[in-house]
Amino acid sequence: RHDNLDRTLPELLAAPNLRCAAVYTHFATADDPGHPLFDLQLERFASARAALASRGVTAASVHAANSAALLRDPGTWFDAVRPGLLLYGLAPAALAGVLALRPALSLRSRVVAVKNIRQGESVGYSARYVADSPRRIATVPAGYADGLDTRLGGRGEVLVNGRRVPIVGAVSMDMLAIDASSGPVYAGDEVVLLGEQGGDRITVAEMASRIGSIQYEVLCRLGSRIERRYNRP
């Protein structure tokens, strides 16, 4: 703790098997521009560094800035920064307009089947979706085992042939269903769950908002069985 430095520093510095390789902090409220704790934490970090310097300790590296701090305050940059979201071309929601960014990732699949269902027929586990009229339902091989949140069922959308198409019914382990009644959709058509198609875009922030979560959780959920393809810009 910052208020225990006078007691703990002498004990740490007296240990023969320890050396100060780096000094760092991690901001609790960097993505909340109106929160006073950000400035207070930066002041306490400066006091801790001064306490070390007064005892002749010079750290090889000083770092504090995550993506949000990097965008809002150059005084946090020191000699290293720790961007997370920014590496993916994303920014914390409250700071989205500070820097022009282009998302560096997309999540895509393909339609594997298309079926016509009658009014009153259901789709998926627990029959959560019941058609109120004849509908055309497409199956996409992506589910919660890939990291898609189950709350996207009935809330989320995907892009197919440049159009937004709603996710219907429950998101299952390996598949989800979309209502493809608004236009032609066929097996093999590309489905964009995150990314751009036909001038429209499904963003990580949008997906997070639809499930009442945050961008970080959406990204961290994406599982290892998703095939990664790396493209040069």
Model-derived features with residue positions:
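Active-site loop/helix belt of alpha/beta enzymes
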Residues: 1-118
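C-terminal accessory subdomain/extension
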Residues: 116-233
